[in-house]
Amino acid sequence: MQEYCYQIRKLKMLKVAILDDYQNVAQQFVDLKKLSGKYEFKIFSEPFLDEADAIEQLADFEALLIMRERTPITKNLIDNLNDLKFVITSGLRNKSVDLEAAKKRKIIVCGTDINVNPTPELTWALILGLARNFKEEIDNMYQGYWQTTIGVELKGKILGLIGLGRVGTEVAKIGKAFGMQVMAWSENLSLDKCKELDVLPCSKDDLITNSDVLSIHVQGGNRYKDCITLKELDKMKKTAF
């Protein structure tokens, strides 16, 4: 009887697919062995050949753990995964999930809390790399040269931000620490937030024409799809990043 109950429990284990873990990081953050009594995990480290391949390989899974927008969870994919009950994404939002199709199938879609620090840190790594010519200097160093360019001092320069949400706020704080003047624009810019951060609210055109460094921190999608085009780039300072 005990053996029979054990077999029943095994049959009821939730089958979970972890998609697009091509950096092999999933097991660094979660000890999957501790969860093996309740869940049967399979990690997909390689991208699918196409959607038909994804449907074939994911047919038996009840839950998909997806990393960002690497594999689109389309209506066609959802409609063809008959056992699918859950879609869990890293981060709060995922533009690649067809939420309407999931809702019709009564599939639960949810996300995780976010760590706001990595994106501002990477943003500032890129800004500093541009201002101090990291790429060119590193390439020249490998050729035997040393200090071949002169960098740009950031203190006193204007940092322009499109978007002043969680990420934009942290980028602004670091900009102020460098002694930069920070300006911001977005369609739903909070004047109270600007006052709190000592950020100058402005029009989009003023932001484009005055910024020495322009950094964009808004959600993807149609709302800001054509936010920066060749027209805007032509208005920027020739020395701007």
Language model features: what each stretch is:
Residues 6-63, 67-68, 179, 183, ...:
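N-terminal glycine-/charge-rich "phosphate-binding" loop or analogous flexible N-terminal tail
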Residues 35-36, 77-83, 233-238:
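Short, conserved loop/helix-junction motifs that constitute active-site signature segments
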Residues 13, 84, 155-158, 230, ...:
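Phosphate-coordination loops involved in phosphoryl transfer and adenosine-cofactor binding
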Residues 61-138, 142, 151-152:
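Phosphate/diphosphate ligand-binding glycine-rich loop within oxidoreductases
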Residues 137-170, 179:
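Glycine-rich NAD(P)-binding loop of Rossmann-like domains
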